[in-house]
């Protein structure tokens, strides 16, 4: 028997017009999101544009996004540094602080999260509640006790007060990883233990590779927070050769004479580049890590 070719029914004319029509709600939505994007990006755009202006004309021509004249000397002057230190020194200090803090926060949080998610112990719910309670504790409450403790340890004017506490875990990262580990079947742990894996081997060989999205998300957040942190370096570091980028930018401002706004804006733009680069390269891990932790 030959197959019968049935004629394809075309949609009515009014349905085709309705499908191709753009609703007013959709237009308003796109206009609103575009306006919001411009408002959010305008300060960053203004910063980059101002870095190519003369310091004397930055605020007198703040309404204009076209540098007149267009100069590059702000970048050369800012890169030479300030307080006897080249700006590359400040970038290296930030890289050391961010690198060590990120490694410490991510790895310690992963170990603690594995303990809460997989290992039964007495009072686990109580200690978990205490850990979550630290999220609601303002950091300012701990600043003075921590400063006194680090001063007695003779840790001032070093990276230790900024880096060492990160090796004791971060409550937000711990919670993020706990939710991720709970999505992994416990049968994998049981199979690994049957094959002779201990707790640490099970964590290192089975769990750690499977929670890579949560690790990446935590690392990105830790990078952001430590790269732009100002309060802790301001408290513990008094030597310019130890300043990170966030604290070094303050040196361009002089309350007694004219501030070098052009060099400060130029180096501020340079300091934003790693943040922007990390965001665009690893944004998929942020979405994947946060969205997956909501699954059960």
UniProtKB/Swiss-Prot annotation:
It comes from Bacillus subtilis (strain 168). Signal peptide: none annotated. It is found in: Cell membrane. InterPro entries: MetI-like, MetI-like_sf. The chain crosses the membrane at residues 27-47, 96-116, 126-146, 161-181, 206-226, 262-282. Keywords: Cell membrane, Membrane, Transmembrane, Transmembrane helix, Transport. Its main location: membrane. It comes from the Bacteria. This is Probable ABC transporter permease protein YesQ. Part of a binding-protein-dependent transport system. Probably responsible for the translocation of the substrate across the membrane. It is a multi-pass membrane protein. The keyword Transport applies. One of its GO terms (cellular component) is plasma membrane. Belongs to the binding-protein-dependent transport system permease family. MalFG subfamily. One of its GO terms (biological process) is transmembrane transport. It holds the Pfam family BPD_transp_1. Residues 91-282 form the ABC transmembrane type-1 domain.
């Amino acid at each position: 028997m030959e197959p019968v070719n049935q004629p394809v029914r075309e949609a009515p004319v009014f349905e085709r017009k309705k499908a191709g029509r753009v609703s007013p709600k959709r237009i308003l939505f796109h206009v609103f999101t575009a306006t919001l994007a411009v408002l959010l990006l305008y300060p960053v755009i203004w910063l980059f544009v101002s870095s190519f202006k003369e310091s004397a004309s930055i605020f007198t021509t703040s309404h204009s996004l076209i540098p007149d004249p267009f100069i590059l000397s702000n970048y050369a002057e800012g890169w030479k540094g300030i307080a006897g230190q080249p700006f590359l020194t400040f970038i290296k200090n930030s890289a050391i602080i961010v690198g060590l803090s990120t490694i410490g926060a991510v790895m310690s949080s992963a170990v603690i999260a594995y303990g809460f998610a997989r290992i039964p112990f007495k009072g686990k719910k109580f200690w978990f509640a205490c850990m979550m309670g630290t999220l609601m504790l303002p950091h300012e409450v701990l600043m003075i006790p921590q400063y006194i403790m680090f001063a007695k340890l003779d840790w001032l004017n070093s990276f230790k007060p900024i880096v060492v506490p990160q090796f004791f875990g971060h409550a937000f990262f711990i919670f993020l990883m706990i939710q991720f580990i709970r999505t992994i079947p416990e049968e994998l742990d049981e199979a690994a233990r049957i094959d002779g894996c201990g707790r640490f081997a099970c964590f290192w060989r089975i769990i750690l590779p499977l929670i890579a999205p949560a690790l990446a998300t935590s690392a990105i957040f830790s990078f952001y927070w430590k790269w732009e942190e100002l309060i802790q370096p301001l408290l513990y570091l008094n030597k310019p050769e130890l300043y990170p980028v966030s604290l070094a930018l303050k040196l361009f401002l002089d309350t007694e004479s004219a501030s070098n706004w052009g060099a400060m804006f130029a180096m501020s733009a340079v300091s934003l580049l790693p943040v922007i680069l990390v965001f665009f390269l690893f944004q998929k891990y942020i979405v994947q890590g946060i969205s997956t932790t909501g699954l059960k």
